[in-house]
Amino acid sequence: MQTLKNLKKTYSQVFISSPDYDSRAVYARRRQFMLKNLDSFCIFAGMPRDPGSEEAFTETWTRFVQEPSFLYLTGISQAGCYLVLDPKSKSETLFVPRKDPFKEFWVGKRLGYLEKDSDVARLTGIRDVRPVEEFDAVLEKLCKKYAKTGFAYALYFDTLQG
């Protein structure tokens, strides 16, 4: 098991941290502030994919820029991730793509879900980390839980083509 310091070095391209302060605590305070001020659940979607990656052989060297709200609350600068905040249970759930060693060979280290691996949780301070495949099921449960509220907050990058 890597030390937190080594984890920060390993994932420095996808998780913003500083040796001068506890970045996990900064992001946790921001999420706690949001949880205290929400009256329904909220979804923060990071950018859905890396620039130019939607078709084979179109990878570009365009710099990836994360959705600002997601980055502000998590410090994660990686495509395909979601954060769900639930004020009723005061919970925060992070959804990340599954660990993909083949992709990491080509694009560098990435945060990823791996069964019985707590690296993402240790790095971000978010205890409930799940694979993105579980996002829809969690969303469905939250919609039922908040059915009387009549609304939810969603901050996401619109990928629909008109």
Language model features by range: what are they?
Residues 1-162:
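A composition/biophysics-driven feature that prefers long, compositionally simple stretches
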